[in-house]
């Protein structure tokens, strides 16, 4: 199983390289249409009541497009946890959440050490999805650094894999319903995080870059439990599916409502949001073409102070140190923990083999489903309430 996972990861890494190369090239074909739509939507939605109605429409049409309408009930679920490790100021466990019958969302749970967590009975919780970064996704050192640092600051952090990446190998990342699977995984990951006894469900945040930023946008739009969100290097004039990975645009979640990425960010108002853009990817002109629209939605709630734009004109498409620092500061202010710089000497970078939930020594449960057809059947069973 380990060999298969490594080979699959290598194939995905190669595909991700091509995806990012395409992502960073010229203007998208739908850019002008998106800008026209924003002008129309802005003229039609000038107060909070109008935005409340629009958000309801966006949620409904997104869920319909993803095959999740009406939103299925999220009942009890099983959680597998193993391989507890303790480091300097934080701990790590390998965790799998059964999100569908026999289908698992895999990840790592980072927690502050009890001595730190004891300062408050409950602390913030933060979801950290990863993007299409070569190689390794959530196993990448910079992703581990982000999660470990936030845990050292007192947050409980759940880092989880995209479908078809790392140890999430029950179907492929180009599965026709991968967008629905990842959205459902995010909802269940949020359920899991909020259920933990040391997490204050009123202080839950989410951040990710690129495809992880898309997941952040989608979940923050759909679920008010995400109290503060920070999508990184992803908000610019685009609408699915042209130019997107299937996990972002493989299902019609934007078309029926004639919406786009920038409107999704605006519809998160009035909850706190940081949108981070850079000069060397398609977000390069977000401060000019996107942020005024997003800010207008927040102003409709008299909450302009709750949305921030950080633009780094000399930086590229990643989640590097300066981007992480901006996100740490934003989350600290809005979720209530102390903001300090990273101290890399206090963070242990683990090997992927340590972080895998499923491996030769920890195999998938016998009831696990395998392949797109079986996963699709499990998805349909969940939707119909079957067991």
Question: Residue ranges of each PLM-predicted region?
Answer:
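Alpha/beta-hydrolase fold nucleophile elbow
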Residues: 198-210
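Cap/lid segment of the alpha/beta-hydrolase catalytic domain
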Residues: 116-195, 234-250
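Alpha/beta-hydrolase-fold serine-hydrolase catalytic core, especially in secreted/extracellular enzymes
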Residues: 26-105, 115, 121, 269, ...
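Loop/turn elements at helix/coil->beta-strand transitions in domains of secreted/extracellular proteins
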Residues: 122-124, 153-156, 200-203, 224-228, ...
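Glycine-rich nucleophile elbow surrounding the catalytic serine of serine-hydrolase chemistry
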Residues: 208-218
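Bacterial Sec-dependent signal peptides at the C-terminal "C-region" and cleavage site
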Residues: 12-30
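Mobile cap/lid helix-loop segments that gate and shape the active-site cleft of serine hydrolases
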Residues: 225-271, 278-291, 297-303
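Bacterial N-terminal signal peptides that target proteins for export
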Residues: 2-13
């Amino acid at each position: 199983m380990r060999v298969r996972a490594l080979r699959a990861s290598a194939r995905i890494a190669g595909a991700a390289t091509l995806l990012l190369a395409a992502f960073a090239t010229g203007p998208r074909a739908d850019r002008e249409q998106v800008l026209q739509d924003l002008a129309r939507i802005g003229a039609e939605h000038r107060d909070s009541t109008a935005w409340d109605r629009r958000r309801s429409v966006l949620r409904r049409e997104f869920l319909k497009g993803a095959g999740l309408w009406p939103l299925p009930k999220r009942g009890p679920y099983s959680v597998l946890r193993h391989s507890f490790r303790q480091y300097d100021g934080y701990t790590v466990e390998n965790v799998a959440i059964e999100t569908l019958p026999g289908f698992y969302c895999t990840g790592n749970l980072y927690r502050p050490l009890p001595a730190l967590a004891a300062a408050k009975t409950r602390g913030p919780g933060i979801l950290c999805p990863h993007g299409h970064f070569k190689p390794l996704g959530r196993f990448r050192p910079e992703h581990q650094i982000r999660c470990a640092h936030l845990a050292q600051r007192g947050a409980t952090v759940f880092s989880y894999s995209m479908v078809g990446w790392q140890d999430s190998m029950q179907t492929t990342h180009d599965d026709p319903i991968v967008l629905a699977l990842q959205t459902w995984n995010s909802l269940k990951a949020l359920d899991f995080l909020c259920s933990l006894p040391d997490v204050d469900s009123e202080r839950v945040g989410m951040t990710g870059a690129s495809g992880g930023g898309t997941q952040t946008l989608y979940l923050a739009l759909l679920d008010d439990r995400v109290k503060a969100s920070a999508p990184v290097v992803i908000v610019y004039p685009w609408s699915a599916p042209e130019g997107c990975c299937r996990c972002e645009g493989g299902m019609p979640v934007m078309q029926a409502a004639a919406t786009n990425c920038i409107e999704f960010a605006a519809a998160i108002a009035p909850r706190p949001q940081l949108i981070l853009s850079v000069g060397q990817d398609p977000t390069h002109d977000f401060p000019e073409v996107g942020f005024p629209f997003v800010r207008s939605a927040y102003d409709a709630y008299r909450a302009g102070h709750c949305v921030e734009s950080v633009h780094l004109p000399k930086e590229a498409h990643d989640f590097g140190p300066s981007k992480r620092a901006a996100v740490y500061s934003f989350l600290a202010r809005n979720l209530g923990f102390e903001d300090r710089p990273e101290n890399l000497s206090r963070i242990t970078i683990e090997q992927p083999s340590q972080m895998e939930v499923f491996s030769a020594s920890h195999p998938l449960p016998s009831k696990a489903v395998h392949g797109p057809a079986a996963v699709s059947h499990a998805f349909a069973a969940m939707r119909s309430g079957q067991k």
